[in-house]
Amino acid sequence: MERALGVGIGPLAAGTVGLLILLKVIQRLRRRPNIQDKVVVITGASSGLGKECARVFHAAGARLILCGRDQRRLQEVVEELGNKTYGKTKTYTPCTVTFDLSNTSVVCSAAAEILKRHGHVDVLINIAGVSYRGNILDTHVSVQREVMETNYFGPVALTQAILPSMVDRGSGHIVVISSVQGKISIPYRSAYAASKHAMQAYYDCLRAEVDSLGLHVSVLSPGYVRTNMSINAVTGDGSKYGVMDRTTATGADPVDVAKDILKAVCQKKKDVVMAGLGPTTAIYLRTLWPALYFRVMASRARKQTGKEE
């Protein structure tokens, strides 16, 4: 009896192990980035995280349409990418469309120009944005509007201009690079946090509304990333902040974040927080123990004077 049982268990165990190995292989194949030949639009592509995403998506074989305000800098990115090869991966020379995302009156014409390039868009990645540093008491409402125009109304206008073509094809992927501050708010970031919260809400609604149409929506929320975001941030009077925050200087490498974005896009992730333990804990704390979270933020505000600690 025992011998017969042993004989039966052996093949069963081997079969189980084989099945597990097969499942692992299938999972790896599914996780492998596959953006080859897809038409990918990237806003804010002339610098920072947008530029790194341009490099990463180009290396993966995407047909890029790079967008930004500065044609010269966009062309520099195109020339840089045009001189690179990536083994057997077929790559394409990116094209560019120059416009100011904060000027929503030109976004529709820019979207039409984008669609002319390849006839359609597979993936729209909204990265362009502006940060803010300031005390609410000293911040003019015009500055609040400026941040909202760039970070919220601009991406929304571009999304709504591109969206009908995706609906007609029954295929498309809208991606927005939000922030941990779209989940929680910290002192002296009011305009920025408000714009990112608005973005989170809008694209959550959009995801539900287009789900039955074959479209995908991803909200990706990094923590601090080592770019010039804080240097270029606006202050309460509209002037540039001009300082590299300590938290920004020690933030994540934009190359690594860009690779994570590629992976999330290929896997069609719906909502991803790309941050360390501290910010992630704060997000959960805000939901599960708000009273403590509010005390922590009040304490942080008292230790600051409108500038990064």
UniProtKB/Swiss-Prot annotation:
EC numbers for this chain: 1.1.-.-
SUPFAM superfamilies in UniProt: NAD(P)-binding Rossmann-fold domains (SSF51735)
Binding site residues for substrate: 179
CDD domains: 11beta-HSD1_like_SDR_c
InterPro entries, A to Z: NAD(P)-bd_dom_sf (IPR036291), Sc_DH/Rdtase_CS (IPR020904), SDR_fam (IPR002347)
Entry's localization field: Endoplasmic reticulum membrane
Residues on Cytoplasmic side: 1-5
List of catalytic residues: 192 (proton acceptor)
GO annotations of cellular component type: endoplasmic reticulum membrane; membrane
Listed transmembrane segments: 6-26
Positions annotated to bind NAD(+): 47, 49, 192, 196, 227
Pfam families, per database record: adh_short
GO terms, molecular function: oxidoreductase activity
Membrane topology classification: Single-pass type II membrane protein
Assigned keywords, A-Z: Endoplasmic reticulum, Membrane, NAD, NADP, Oxidoreductase, Signal-anchor, Transmembrane, Transmembrane helix
Lumenal compartment residues: 27-271
Entry function: Putative oxidoreductase.
Family: Belongs to the short-chain dehydrogenases/reductases (SDR) family.
Protein's name according to its UniProt entry: Dehydrogenase/reductase SDR family member 7B
